[in-house]
């Protein structure tokens, strides 16, 4: 299984266009040891030729340009993206579909809740129906059964409902429904390598922990270091848990969760611009290093 990190930042990217927190200011003027990142998205493949896009970042055009395998140029217009899987209906995970309209029709796999949000509140499905057949919805069931996607037939996917938050525009924002957010457990039938992918993760219970323990590689929510980070940095008024993101530090935080699982690789993704782990010289980054936890970066490649 090939895993390509196309984008590793949370919504807004890093640096965020209107943000002057320590990290954003520092990456612009060189005073912070950090590298810019685009908004979160990954690509998966079973053969390195056909790819499944997991979430469609607003930065998808730049991400494709940075990864030539997605544009193999075999014909006048071409793409190696054979399918798209949406793990939620967040703006920063779906807006990229607009930039992919020239390649319609696209096979888009998502839950019924996500399809509802993208048909009504943020109506990408009806909007893009005017471009060569638009988006063809392929429903993801929440029955715990593995499913295959024809673009990469040697991969098996299992959708895992997560406790997180629907986007602000969704009628489910304050009324969570199963399927608003999912994680993916992905298995390669040839190598037996396994991935657990959950860029938006608000709570971890014992059932979810069991899925995480089965994975060779964890690619999980790295949004915030501390739950009150947005308030402390004076860039927001919500706690991480109110936004559906489990902070890394503190009792029950992601660091404690990851210490309970044996995965060979533990990687944080969807990292907010305020998070001190973006600074490679920070004490927080040193704590991750000491714990064997990696920080995803744009262009990172993992093979299982």
UniProtKB/Swiss-Prot annotation:
Pfam families: Lactamase_B_2 (PF12706)
InterPro entries: Metallo-B-lactamas, PQQ_synth_PqqB, RibonucZ/Hydroxyglut_hydro
UniProt entry keywords in alphabetical sequence: PQQ biosynthesis, Transport
Transport keyword on record: yes
Record-level GO BP terms: pyrroloquinoline quinone biosynthetic process
Pathway it works in: Cofactor biosynthesis; pyrroloquinoline quinone biosynthesis
Biological role stated in the UniProt entry: May be involved in the transport of PQQ or its precursor to the periplasm.
NCBIfam families in UniProt: PQQ_syn_pqqB
Recorded family membership: Belongs to the PqqB family.
Name of the protein: Coenzyme PQQ synthesis protein B
Organism: Pseudomonas aeruginosa (strain UCBPP-PA14)
Gene: pqqB
